[in-house]
């Protein structure tokens, strides 16, 4: 089940004693639909004793003596949490490491929630008396290198209570060889040590590269085994790409030639020239023929030209009649006939032996020159000579020719029969069946196909007979292969057009109708969309250009709740002088969105209830001494319970002046939960900025833009993670020094800040890293571009990865990559949410964030990720949070990234339209289905956790153990993993979210805009796109295997991903085919119309999209520049990227002082010593720190809980490195 979030309101003693350990909802015992978690059937914990801490009432229980101010007027029934009727049975799934909820289930199995056997709510079991407050052992029951696959429901024995005041030894991670392995662990280790057979992929790569042995590769600069393996995998991938390109080329150009070979010569009726003579529907070239001497024909005469009667172009079928075949028995000898016969009754001829015109205009001529049977060629020699002639081609009729009313034509089995030739029968010579005359005189069969009319045995004989005696040609037909090729062509055409059209129209529908649902009702910017779009375009002309000032007073956030009144509501007054200005509009039938703040709406502010009275100094917005001590005594957030402090019992005996209990005097006060300046409940956001080698101007631009967003400072905090002690190329100071120079009002002086250890995302000895945590407030600087009236107080925390003492003298100490910077926050959020053991660094992050915000870190629901060279539009954060709050199914989103240095060079110019089309076409289309495959790391937002079902139930999203575990993968040993994790970590995070939560949404919010500078040198662009293209290919390979995405078969996101993958792989071949098609269309005939039309549509639809969605006509010019640069986009960049599949460096994209580009992921980094990293729960750290600060003996108290309000997740003692 999703992790419960249950506050502990005050209850009566009677209630405490009589409360049942089970809840009311019969569906809570069912596993959560999203995670499929099934609680253990046998409770692993001992039963609760009488007199211990009572169970809290369910948030939706009628016995709960509190009611949230913003509670849903139509609350969701608890049965909604249960699994709905479905054909899907999660319990039948195979739960292995490939399962999207594998790690979540392992964590959830250890939650303090006992399963219900009566169908009531799950029970939060407080095992206070069973926990060990201190431990004398420095060793844990696990190893950093151990793979844990055991039963997640295995019960954990409670520890023994230690004597009061016994000093607690630090808990540390230890190596595997420092403890004894259990039998189960030995078995697993033995399985891991087994040599596994090579995979099919490795075998294929070895076969493809058999011609390059290792010794040869070593001579070409590949001494490391990992390098050679990456090179072989690269060649394997390139071979597959070439095969796919060859297949596409075959379908485009070779398939028709293969299945529809060029037919023989076919001559259209009435177009057979004088060099041919027609016999039985075939044209014979008699241009060079010589006839033997015969009566009326000289020796070696050519019958086409040398005789008085010119036979060229005529039909001579009557001169070589097919007699006594199918017509035997139908056409018989007439009484008194002169036609010769033999003993079998075979006739010598049926018609007069003469020729007739091919157009059927010849009159019937029954006379014979010289003698009866002249020119009938009845001798064997004549017949054999005729049969030896080679037919030049077939004479064909079109259906228009057949339906010509001037002729009496019909079709039988593909042969064209001239029924008027039946008039040439001589009654005195032969007799024929009456059916012949009926067919000839029946006007309804003229121009028709008689194949299905003549179906009886007799009728079929009549049809075959007519074919033998009256055939004049064949119907114009195509072979099966030609028909198949046309079917493939038109199906492909329709298919591609359907995809292009659907993508275009759905993207347009998203821009016009769907996108507006995400936007906030009111912001600090103008409410006119056209005016705002123009301001954004002007703003993006220069990276340093400030945002426009507020020009529309009606849209300001001051005093606005984001709602518009209806005309009908003005008839009667809806408010009075006693109505709170922050009152929630309960007239709406839709339930209000759920946030952490709205769920804590029964909380009140510090004594006095008003942030500007009693506890606060109204002039300087600072806490007075009494308020600061009150906050320090509670160690909770500024939102305190209206009836009791959440965990005041934990801190009752602590000195409020201790180092942990201090909250900064400049902390931004929290407004009431009912305050909705933008029309939706506010949610707390962490703005994560990852910095590497950026300069002062770039970082200042980014932090200024975040600090001056119109989103309230009480609900946002800036977190900057500096990836090592790095000095950018051409910079006078290191990046950490630059960032620290932008902070003020430090909680701890920078020179007094210590470095703390944590487990980094790396390999070998680099897994141990150290970092410093600086907490304070953002300082705009003395020469700030920001107007002093706009400078606001924004809490800020900086994490500087400084490295271990061993790497202090090395290059780039502390540098572990951007993914490690993100994991620092993600892992921290996971451990806060699950109350797991955390490192010292994470404990300091907890304290630092709480001291400068007054909020517990678990109150933060979203993370805005911004690169340190990006500038955010003032209302972008407001729109992004609006989308998240309005739709809890959205787990990730991104805004539009615009280019600030458009005219820096031709390299930057060709990127303008590419950025535009990637957002407004690709991402808009994917947003319709909630499946944006790539959320750019420079400007995106992820949901930390999402409300689920009833009140106070939350599901971890970004903080989900499966996300954190997979994203923090440190065993990167294959080409696929290296491209995913070393080059495209931002895109891989989006892929990982979709794989883990395929039913949730990732969308594009066009109202959120940022600007950035793009590469203006071609070598930098080449390096950047190499990383992006290779990352795209490998992420699409991962995503195409996810079967649970929206839709089915061809109408699914999975199929769209497959098409994108194939399209990306064949880009170089496709552009080559395009140019070939254009060239052959110019130089050869006939012109291939269909491919050209398809090409025009594909290239022309974006122009229509510009007209309908863009706000400047200049984008037409940018599109023209983009089309001219298509060879670069579709050939040069992809081909270079494919050839560099085994290059995992960032190349020219981010250069530091004195850095030399090298291939990443191939160096040996030593051995990881886990004993240097201490991990404890927050309560243990807190107790130890306060005990040391007070200098007194710590009296054992019930286990400390973090100020999140969540119970400790018992069962996470050891740190596991999966």
Swiss-Prot record:
Pfam family, one: CHS4
Feature: compositional bias, Basic and acidic residues: 14-34, 175-190
Activity regulation text: Activity is stimulated by Mg(2+), and is more inhibited by polyoxin D than by nikkomycin.
Segments of this protein annotated with the region Disordered: 1-93, 132-190, 548-570, 582-606, 1188-1218
pH dependence, record text: Optimum pH is 7.5.
Temperature notes for this entry: Optimum temperature is from 30 to 45 degrees Celsius.
Cell location: Cell membrane
Outcome of gene disruption: Leads to reduced chitin content, abnormal yeast clumpiness and budding kinetics, and increased melanin secretion. Does not affect virulence in an acute mouse model. Also leads to increased expression of the other chitin synthase genes for compensation.
Extent of Polar residues compositional bias: 71-80, 133-142, 553-562, 1189-1198
GO CC terms in record: cell septum; plasma membrane
PTM statement from Swiss-Prot or TrEMBL: Maximal activity requires trypsin activation, suggesting a zymogenic nature.
One GO process term, biological-process aspect: chitin biosynthetic process
Claim: tRNA-binding is one of the keywords in the record: no
Keyword Manganese recorded: no
GO molecular function: chitin synthase activity
Cysteine-cysteine disulfides: none
E.C. no: 2.4.1.16
Broad class of enzyme this protein falls into: transferase
Keyword entries, A-Z: Cell membrane, Glycoprotein, Glycosyltransferase, Membrane, Transferase, Transmembrane, Transmembrane helix
Family of the protein in this entry: Belongs to the chitin synthase family. Class IV subfamily.
Task performed by this protein: Polymerizes chitin, a structural polymer of the cell wall and septum, by transferring the sugar moiety of UDP-GlcNAc to the non-reducing end of the growing chitin polymer. CHS4 synthesizes a large amount of chitin and appears to play a role in the process of cell separation. CHS4 is particularly well suited for functioning at the higher temperatures associated with its poorly characterized saprophic environment and with human infection.
Name of the featured protein: Chitin synthase 4
């Amino acid at each position: 089940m999703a992790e419960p979030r249950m506050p502990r309101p005050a209850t009566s003693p009677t209630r405490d004693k009589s409360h049942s350990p089970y809840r009311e909802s019969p569906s809570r015992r069912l596993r959560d639909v999203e995670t499929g978690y099934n609680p253990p059937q046998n409770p692993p914990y001992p039963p609760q004793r009488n007199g211990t801490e009572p169970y809290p009432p369910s948030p939706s229980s009628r016995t709960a003596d509190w009611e949230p101010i913003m509670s849903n007027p139509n609350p969701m029934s608890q049965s909604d949490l249960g699994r709905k009727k479905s054909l899907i049975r999660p319990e039948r799934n195979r739960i292995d490491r490939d399962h999207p909820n594998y790690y979540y289930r392992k964590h959830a199995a250890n939650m303090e929630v006992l399963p219900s056997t009566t169908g009531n709510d799950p029970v939060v079991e407080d095992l206070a008396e069973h926990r060990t407050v201190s431990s004398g052992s420095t060793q844990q029951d696990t190893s950093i290198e151990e793979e844990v696959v055991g039963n997640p429901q295995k019960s954990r024995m409670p520890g023994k209570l230690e004597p009061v005041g016994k000093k607690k030894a630090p808990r540390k991670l230890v190596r595997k060889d420092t403890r004894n392995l259990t039998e189960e662990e030995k078995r697993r280790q033995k399985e891991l040590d087994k040599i596994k057979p090579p995979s099919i992929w490795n075998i294929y790569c070895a076969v493809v590269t058999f011609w390059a042995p290792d010794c040869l590769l070593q001579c070409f600069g590949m001494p490391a085994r990992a390098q050679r393996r990456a090179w072989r995998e690269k060649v394997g991938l390139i071979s597959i790409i070439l095969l796919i390109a060859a297949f596409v080329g075959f379908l485009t150009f070779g398939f028709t030639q293969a299945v529809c070979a060029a037919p023989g010569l076919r001559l259209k009726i009435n177009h057979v020239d004088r060099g041919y003579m027609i016999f039985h529907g075939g044209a014979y070239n008699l241009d060079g023929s010589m006839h033997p001497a015969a009566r009326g024909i000289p020796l070696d005469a050519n019958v086409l030209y040398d005789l008085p009667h010119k036979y060229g172009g005529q039909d001579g079928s009557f001169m070589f009649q097919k007699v006594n075949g199918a017509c035997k028995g139908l056409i018989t000898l007439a009484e008194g006939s002169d036609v010769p016969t033999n003993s079998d009754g075979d006739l010598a001829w049926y018609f007069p032996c003469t020729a007739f015109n091919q157009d059927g205009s010849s009159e019937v001529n029954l006379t014979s020159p010289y003698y009866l049977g002249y020119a009938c060629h009845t001798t064997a020699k004549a017949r054999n000579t005729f049969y030896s002639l080679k037919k030049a081609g077939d004479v064909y009729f079109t259906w228009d020719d057949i339906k010509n009313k001037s002729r009496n034509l019909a079709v039988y089995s593909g042969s064209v029969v001239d029924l008027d030739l039946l008039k040439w029968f001589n009654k005195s010579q032969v007799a024929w069946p009456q059916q012949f005359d009926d067919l000839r005189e029946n006007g309804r069969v003229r121009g028709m196909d008689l194949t299905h009319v003549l179906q009886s045995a007799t009728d079929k004989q009549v049809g075959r007979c007519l074919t033998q005696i009256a055939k004049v040609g064949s119907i114009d037909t195509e072979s099966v292969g030609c028909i198949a090729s046309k079917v493939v062509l038109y199906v492909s055409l329709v298919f591609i057009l359907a995809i292009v059209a659907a993508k275009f129209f759905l993207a347009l529908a998203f821009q016009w109708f769907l996108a507006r649902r995400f936007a906030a009702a009111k912001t600090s910017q103008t409410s006119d969309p056209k005016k705002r779009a123009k301001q954004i375009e002007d703003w993006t002309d220069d990276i340093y250009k400030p945002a426009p000032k507020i020009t529309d007073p009606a849209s300001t956030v001051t005093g606005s709740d984001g709602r518009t009144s209806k005309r009908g509501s003005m008839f009667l007054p809806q408010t009075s002088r006693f109505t709170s200005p922050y009152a929630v509009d309960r007239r709406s039938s839709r339930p209000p969105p759920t946030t952490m703040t709205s769920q804590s709406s029964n909380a009140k502010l510090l004594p006095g209830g008003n942030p500007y009275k009693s506890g606060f100094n109204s002039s300087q917005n600072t806490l007075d001494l009494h308020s600061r001590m009150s906050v320090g005594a509670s160690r909770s957030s500024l939102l305190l319970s209206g009836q009791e402090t959440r965990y005041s019992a934990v801190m009752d005996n602590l000195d409020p002046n201790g180092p942990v209990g201090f909250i900064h005097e400049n902390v931004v006060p929290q407004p009431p939960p009912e305050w909705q300046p933008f029309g939706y409940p506010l949610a707390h956001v962490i703005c994560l900025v990852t910095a590497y080698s950026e300069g002062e101007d770039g970082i200042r631009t980014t932090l200024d833009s975040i600090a001056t967003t119109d989103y309230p400072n009480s609900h946002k905090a800036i977190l900057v993670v500096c990836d090592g002690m790095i000095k950018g190329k051409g910079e006078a100071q290191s990046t950490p020094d630059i960032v620290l120079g932008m902070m003020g009002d430090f909680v701890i002086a920078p020179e007094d800040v210590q470095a703390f250890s944590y487990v980094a995302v790396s390999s070998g000895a680099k897994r141990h890293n150290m970092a410093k945590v600086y907490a304070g407030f953002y300082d705009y600087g003395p020469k700030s571009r920001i107007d002093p009236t706009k400078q606001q107080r924004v809490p800020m925390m900086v994490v500087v990865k400084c490295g271990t003492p061993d790497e202090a003298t090395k290059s780039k100490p502390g540098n572990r990559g951007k993914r490690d910077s993100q994991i620092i926050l993600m892992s921290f959020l996971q451990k806060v949410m699950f109350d797991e053991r955390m490192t010292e660094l994470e404990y300091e992050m907890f304290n630092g964030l709480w001291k400068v915000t007054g909020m517990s870190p678990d109150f933060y629901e979203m993370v805005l990720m911004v690169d340190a060279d990006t500038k955010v539009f003032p209302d972008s954060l407001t729109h992004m949070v609006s989308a998240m709050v309005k739709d809890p199914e959205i787990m990730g989103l991104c805004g539009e990234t615009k280019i600030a240095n458009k005219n820096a060079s031709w390299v930057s110019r060709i990127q303008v339209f590419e950025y535009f089309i990637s957002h407004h076409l690709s991402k808009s289309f994917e947003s319709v289905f909630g499946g944006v495959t790539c959320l750019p790391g420079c400007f995106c937002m992820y949901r930390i956790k999402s409300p689920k079902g009833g009140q106070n139930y939350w599901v971890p999203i970004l903080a989900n153990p499966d996300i954190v575990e997979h994203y923090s993968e440190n065993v990167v040993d294959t080409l696929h993993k290296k491209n995913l994790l070393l080059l495209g970590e931002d895109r891989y995070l989006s892929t990982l979210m979709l794989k883990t939560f395929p039913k949730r949404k990732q969308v594009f919010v066009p109202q959120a805009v940022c600007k950035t500078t793009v590469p203006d040198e071609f070598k930098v662009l080449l390096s950047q796109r190499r990383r992006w293209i290779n990352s795209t290919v490998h992420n699409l390979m991962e995503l195409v295997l996810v079967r649970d995405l929206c839709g089915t078969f061809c109408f699914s996101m999975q199929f769209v991903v497959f098409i994108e993958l194939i399209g990306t792989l064949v880009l170089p071949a496709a552009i080559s085919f395009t140019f070939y098609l254009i060239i052959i269309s110019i130089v050869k005939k006939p012109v291939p119309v269909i491919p050209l039309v398809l090409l025009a549509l594909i290239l022309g639809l974006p122009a229509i999209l510009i007209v309908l969605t863009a706000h400047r006509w200049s984008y037409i010019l940018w599109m023209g520049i983009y089309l001219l640069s298509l060879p670069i986009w579709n050939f040069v960049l992809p081909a270079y990227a494919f050839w560099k599949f085994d290059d995992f460096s960032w190349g020219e994209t981010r250069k530091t002082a004195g850095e030399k580009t090298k291939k990443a992921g191939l160096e040996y980094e030593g051995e990881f010593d886990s004993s240097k990293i201490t991990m404890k729960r927050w309560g243990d750290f807190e107790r130890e720190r306060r005990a040391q600060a007070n200098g007194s003996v710590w009296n054992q108290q019930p286990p400390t809980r973090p100020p999140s309000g969540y119970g400790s997740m018992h069962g996470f003692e050891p740190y596991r490195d999966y």
